[in-house]
């Protein structure tokens, strides 16, 4: 049971804001039964309104009007939060039929629409994806059994992975089924049979996902017409457990909305029964998901505040409206109030009041999101364009600062106090790790962060003796990963975007999770320690530390620890795989979850990616040699690189950022100018003439870059003015390429140093041999970009 004590959390004050539009068609007008989805795309924060009905009719069974199916539409309108301007969008492609009472969810810059009801009855059960980057509708087709047509259901993306659907009405009866689609593939619906106390079938409920993946279901109306006030959380893991929230909601309701503002779920409006809207202080209810309490939103009343409060109650009385949130701002649009179809847009800023004193099960009293914006613009693919859902839709999370999903307790931790009431806590000082079978490892955080990074170095920096661990469980706990990330992030934040470095220096190309290759390079050509060569030579790593290989965690944790130990000698810049958009697809997220447990692994992955957003983006050696991960693209200038602000979010920032992370030289010195690149939309290749002009314009002599597999480990371009270096051998287990580093002496002479792929075991034929250092299943499903100079088949 939730604690008895309550605390003040002032209900946010909503106000109607003035909006603008160029034509009557741009303005959505009065609307009900529609959806509102917040998305960051094309460098702007937008609210996307879809569907609904523009008319309402009298309901003979109720004193409240209902949606008129004659007025149902499939129009799309965008509201720019900054300019407050509405714009009608006209996406091309597989346009869904007009519908209302459908469900919408955001996945990257894709808005997913499912179900609803139109003039001829329930809409089809297909998922339609509105690709906001290309203004195009895509009908997502999957094989096997699918959710039946329905309306009045709930849907959202849980844990940035599962598309979850629950309940609704199929036109004949209220359903009680739960469905999930794994956006990582295979792309098929699974009808779930969750354990726990499963909620009853209902329609017109609300469903919202907390950032750590808990799917919250609130209210609704059941098959007998009873209005529900219960709340459930669905935890998407191996067991898929429904957990009821013990605290009693201020009021049962249906046809309401619920959106998160930080860790607090704001439940807005709705109907109490067929004759009455929710009103009074219950019109906006707030569930603190940290404590499991419905919080007290009332403040001491004066005559002035009392009048204002009554105005707020009246303003928020509505049903069949739409709502969305951007960070700490909540938006509500339209709906029905008695006999009025509303067209207003309301906004409120959530209170920053703190929670009560922390409980033992949440000692740091963590909060989530607050002012931060959780938006996911579309990524570039580091591989050739793919047609799968996951490749089209996965995207970079861009925000003012990455929110820490690990700050939220588990749903059991939030909603239960003791083992007697359903929650058995872990041993003090322990945390679940490894596979989902429930291994427990004691956290060793009595040591200082300084001791922690030394522990990492002593454990991992073994150039002569390192072998892949037989046990895949990672040796660091989540809290240790977090502490290490916090410490190294401070260092990166204080470094410039463009590093100014001296020679001698070693330059490393893409490593991609190949820890064995990194140790071989350290063993053959010196390693960064006092016993090695760190006292007389620096190290520069050009990015792409993670993905595709089996040991990305070892690589990034060692490099972070070395950066803490030798901040002036170890230098890291960012690659295109150092982003949520890329490494959620190409293996790093999977590795984190497999080796640290699904929950802690996901949180560690988020935390590491937060550090990636602060990595420098380029380096200058002796003011003569530019080092970047990708290239110069459309011929950027040094000043443009220096002026990129961090934290930086690829694909939502400038074209300069995209160019330095993604662009490549043309295939050979005979291909001049700027040409399209097969990696994806907006990516270019640059010819030798572009390189020469860039060097002359910026007073430089050479460019060093990584980003492409090259057969010999390094390759010259533009008459030797540009060198590509790639450090991982046998890329993805098929390329048979050498790995290399570039050692640059005090005389600025470059010495390539190579390692070659290990031969297959004597007992295996070359044709049958599988290089287990790479994620073979992933690399087969999503083949890598071919080695430079080779064409894809």
From Swiss-Prot:
Kelch repeats: 53-109, 110-160, 214-262, 264-314, 329-388
Cellular component per GO, a single term: plasma membrane
Enzyme superclass (EC): hydrolase
Record: residues binding Mn(2+) 1: 510, 512, 544
Ranges that cross the membrane: none
Positions of modified residues (Phosphoserine): 395, 444, 764
Tissues/organs with expression: Mainly expressed in young, elongating tissues. In young seedlings, it is expressed at the base of the hypocotyl, at the tip and most peripheral cell layers of cotyledons, and in the vascular cylinder of roots, particularly in the elongation zone and at the point of emergence of lateral roots. In mature plants, it is still present in the root vasculature, but almost completely absent in fully expanded stems and leaves.
Required cofactor(s): Mn(2+)
Activity modulation notes: Activated by phosphorylation at Ser-764 by CDG1.
Family label: Belongs to the PPP phosphatase family. BSU subfamily.
Protein's job: Phosphatase that acts as a positive regulator of brassinosteroid (BR) signaling. Dephosphorylates BES1, a transcription factor that regulates the expression of BR-response genes, thereby playing an important role in the regulation of response to BRs. Inactivates the negative regulator of BR signaling ASK7/BIN2 by dephosphorylation at 'Tyr-200'.
Stated name of the protein: Serine/threonine-protein phosphatase BSU1
Organism of this sequence: Arabidopsis thaliana
Lineage: Eukaryota, Viridiplantae, Streptophyta, Embryophyta, Tracheophyta
Name of the gene encoding the protein in the UniProt record: BSU1
